[in-house]
């Protein structure tokens, strides 16, 4: 499988997983319902996020915020798609995870952009707690974007191996 095909396949899997889970949440839970999975640690919830990943930029005028966030997502999509298109057939030294990372980011960005364009908000449902600490609810797309960004950062920070 080519590196480009790997990226695009992973993006499609992330997009499909994101859509399936969001549709399930929207059809089985009323807004703000909670299902405790691990009490005090992990819940499944139904929330709508009008901002970015993890609730960032959720304040502000609705129309201008949605336009700005959709534009940012579109720029990210085009940039990542361009990087995928330019992937060399063989992995350059130190770039083993780049196709997977780009696929995760592309799939996650597509998933959240789909919600934002159709509904003006993104469905979030994964809710983590650690004692009194509470992480904002997130979804599969947010997770994929975060994991992809971490993989890219690790590849950039990892020293090149010498033969």
PLM segments and residue spans:
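Alpha-helical transmembrane bundles and membrane-interface segments of multipass inner-membrane proteins
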Residues: 1-163
């Amino acid at each position: 499988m080519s590196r480009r095909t790997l990226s695009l396949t992973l993006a499609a899997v992330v997009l499909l997983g994101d859509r399936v889970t969001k549709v399930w949440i929207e059809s089985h839970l009323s807004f703000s319902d909670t299902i405790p999975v691990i009490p005090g640690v992990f819940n499944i919830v139904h929330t709508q996020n009008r901002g970015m990943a993890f609730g960032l930029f959720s304040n502000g005028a609705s129309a201008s915020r949605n336009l700005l966030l959709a534009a940012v997502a579109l720029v990210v999509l085009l940039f990542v798609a361009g990087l995928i298109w330019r992937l060399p057939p063989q992995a350059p030294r130190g770039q083993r995870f780049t196709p997977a990372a780009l696929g995760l980011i592309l799939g996650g960005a597509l998933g959240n952009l789909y919600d934002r364009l159709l509904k003006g908000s993104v469905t979030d449902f994964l809710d983590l707690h650690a004692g009194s600490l509470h992480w904002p609810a997130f979804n599969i797309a947010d997770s994929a974007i975060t994991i992809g960004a971490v993989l890219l950062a690790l590849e950039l920070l990892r020293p090149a191996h010498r033969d």
